[in-house]
Amino acid sequence: MQIDARHGSADKTSHQVMPLPFGKLVLCLLVAGTIAALIAVLLYPPLNPLALFSMLDWNLIAAAEPLVRQCGSLPLLDKFPSLGWNTVLFCATLPSTDEPLRTDSFVAHTRDTILANLGSVEPNWRWKVSSETPEACSLAYHRQRVLSAWLASAEHSVCLQALARRDTRLISFYFVLSGHIEITDRRTRKTLSISPNHVASARERAGNRMTIQSESSWLAFHIPESALRRSFEDLTGRPYVHEFVLPATCFSQDDVQGLYQTLRQAERDLNSAASKAMPLLAKAYKQLALVKLFSTMPHNLAEAFCQGTSGAAPRQLLKAEAFMRENLTNPVTIEDLAAAARCTPRALQRMFRTYRGGSPMSVLCNYRLAAAHGAIKAGRAGSITELALNLQFSNPGRFSVLYKSAYGLSPSSALRFTRNEGSVEQA
């Protein structure tokens, strides 16, 4: 009987399942996702690993950060739903492996091939061709990568309709040569209309609708907002405090035609450049295009770029911003800002939303992120945690998420690049 009891106890013990620690569970999920992505890359040769990670919008926090601290700050949990959806979206938009390999340039003459190829080169848009399209139709498309940005040009006889699947944090500039483009923003319910010889900027937000008229010809310049932000701050030495907007503008005029000519020349030169010269040439053209964009186009940041002001802002708002710049390393509340501006908190919030497109605290956050970026680039940052705490970010993990959202890479990566550049210069 004693033997049976011991065996029974052993059986019960063997059937008990030990719970998996939370940190190990998070690590297992991340490892499983990485393995799945690598398998997809190996099994599908045209798949670009960098494009996959960009599509997943991963935030890779420094490996030196303890996993417990990452889990405690919970930035990863907030990302899991979007990671899952983005993975499904990316896989769903892949063409079949039975189909011939597609390049970034194509010419299609049937409705089905037009949709298939557009879905391959522009996967964030759900494309449709007008039902009135005749059997004899055509679409010629070419895309040219310019580092983190890219150029896309097209000429087509069909009417195209598209629905954006998700937010991409891209700013797109559409130059319409012939035809017409309309983009409707789902959030603001406003429609941007771009007629021939005009250019305007638009954001790829989930639910946005785009209609491109038949017999249209256009050039698009797509760039991450983080790259636009870095360029603006590097050129002006001031923080990028609100979203960039370029209204519909005629680009055939002499003073604003330079950007279009630069992009066309970049398209030609990069298409014929040798592989060794491509990175340096792309970097030069990207910098030149952004300088011309900021200095010659009538965007909403033009006055701030040229004169160091952000328009005729109220005196109270300017006082609040001056107080922000003087107290980047000190705790600041909305009441402190209102007292410095000598107005009520509600009035101050209303002024910031009108003239800065955001709340006072979001503008203060942008100032602090810009200060962190400047400290990292100048080599003044000892550690990311110390830098975050010094600038009043109580959660280093959250600081990493905000920094990457603003500048396109994690602060630890930016710090590592700065140190590597410094060591190369010393050598």
Curated annotation (Swiss-Prot):
Q: Does the keyword Transmembrane helix apply?
A: yes
**Top-rank lineage group of the source organism:** Bacteria
- Asked if the record carries the keyword Transmembrane helix, the reply is yes
Record's subcellular location? Membrane
Q: Which UniProt keywords apply?
A: DNA-binding, Membrane, Plasmid, Transcription, Transcription regulation, Transmembrane, Transmembrane helix
PROSITE patterns (alphabetical): HTH_ARAC_FAMILY_1 (PS00041), HTH_ARAC_FAMILY_2 (PS01124)
Q: Which Pfam family name is an example for this entry? A: HTH_18
Task: Give the membrane topology, semicolon-separated if more than one.
Answer: Single-pass membrane protein
Q: Which InterPro entries has this protein been placed in?
A: AraC_XylS_family_regulators (IPR050204), Homeodomain-like_sf (IPR009057), HTH_AraC (IPR018060), HTH_AraC-typ_CS (IPR018062)
Quote the DNA-binding region ranges, renumbered to this chain: 335-356, 384-407
Q: Which parts of the chain span the membrane according to its record?
A: 25-45
Q: What is this protein called?
A: Uncharacterized HTH-type transcriptional regulator y4fK
Of the GO CC terms on this record, one is: membrane
Q: Which residues does the UniProt record annotate as the domain HTH araC/xylS-type?
A: 318-417
Mention one GO molecular function: sequence-specific DNA binding
